[in-house]
């Protein structure tokens, strides 16, 4: 925020002129003086008052410190695997922003993260009454029409490239890349403006994550619900190309984590309710149009050898 410059002016001392007493009771002079005082107030006092007003609170975005791991996770979606106990944890996902409708309570969802130089590891632990998987393990299908977990990544942090990854409970993957051909312009909810989307936001559906590894498992819980674990290993060289790097290192990059769920109409086999959850809040159904709405991952340094 720029600091307003204060200019001090030293007025020359003027002789005191005595006015006739009758002048102060002249209505025209009284009105003129009142206007002068009001003008002084608007010119000098109001700017000071406005400067004293606190700045609007920034649209805070979440941050998470992610520990380095010497041991690679087994990528078997094993709920008892101990290495995940050392991971950074996002304990819950909140509902996406939907000003048109108040959604139900979010379903229990936890995200865990670890990193090595070659890989970013992500584990989703999702609980629900059941999971809708209309496209099975087909690649690049519309998996968002069923139950999925989603990852959005912007390793450079300038909102010019957005990588999207969706994974469903049967191992189906949808991977996309979005590219901006100009400086992003966002409106409400940090969603790209209509004009920008029409002109400068490009989707590359033909792009695929090379060497991506995914593992899933499902486990019945005592209350009748089901736990779904998705382990995802993201190769560093696939997300660091714009940096000119192939390995992760301590530092920051932008990310978001989401889950799509909702009740299904048995008659149609389609969703009768949309339950969209996210780590960093985005407009309902529009995370792929909100590259400036991501949170921040802070990759921590490895512990020195003992």
Where are these regions (language model features)?
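Basic/polar N-terminal segments that are highly enriched at the extreme N-terminus
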Residues: 7-13, 17-18, 48-60, 305-306
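Intrinsically disordered, low-complexity segments enriched in proline/serine/threonine
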Residues: 17, 22-24, 29, 40, ...
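Residue-level micro-sites within transmembrane alpha helices that shape
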Residues: 32-34, 50, 146
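Bacterial N-terminal signal peptides
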Residues: 34-47
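Structural preference for beta-rich elements and adjacent junctions enriched in aromatics
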Residues: 53-306
């Amino acid at each position: 925020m720029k600091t307003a410059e204060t200019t001090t002016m030293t007025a020359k001392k003027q002789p005191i002129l005595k006015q006739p007493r009758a002048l102060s009771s002249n209505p025209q002079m009284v009105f003129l003086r009142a206007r002068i005082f009001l003008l002084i107030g608007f010119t000098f006092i109001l700017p000071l008052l406005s400067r004293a007003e606190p700045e609007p609170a920034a649209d805070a975005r979440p941050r998470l410190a992610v520990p380095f791991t010497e041991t690679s996770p087994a990528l078997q979606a094993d709920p008892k695997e101990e290495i995940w106990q050392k991971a950074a944890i996002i304990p819950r996902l909140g509902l996406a922003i939907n000003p048109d409708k108040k959604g139900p309570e979010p379903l229990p969802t936890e995200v865990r993260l670890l990193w090595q130089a070659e890989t970013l590891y992500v584990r989703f632990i999702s609980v629900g009454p059941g999971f809708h998987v209309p496209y099975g393990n087909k690649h690049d299908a519309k998996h968002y029409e069923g139950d999925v977990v989603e990852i959005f990544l912007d390793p450079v942090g300038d909102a010019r490239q957005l990588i999207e990854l969706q994974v469903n409970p049967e191992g189906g993957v949808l991977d996309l890349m979005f590219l901006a051909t100009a400086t992003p312009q966002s409106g409400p909810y940090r969603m790209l403006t209509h004009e920008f989307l029409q002109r400068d936001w490009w989707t590359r559906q033909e792009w695929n994550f090379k060497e991506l590894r995914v593992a899933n498992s499902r486990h019945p819980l005592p209350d009748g619900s089901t736990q779904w674990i998705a382990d995802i290993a993201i190769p560093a060289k696939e997300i660091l190309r714009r940096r000119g790097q192939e390995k992760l290192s301590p530092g920051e990059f932008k990310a978001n984590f989401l889950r799509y769920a909702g009740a299904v109409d048995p008659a149609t086999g389609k969703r009768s309710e949309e339950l969209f959850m996210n780590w960093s809040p985005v407009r309902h159904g529009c995370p792929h149009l909100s590259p400036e709405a991501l949170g921040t991952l802070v990759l921590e340094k490895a512990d020195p050898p003992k």
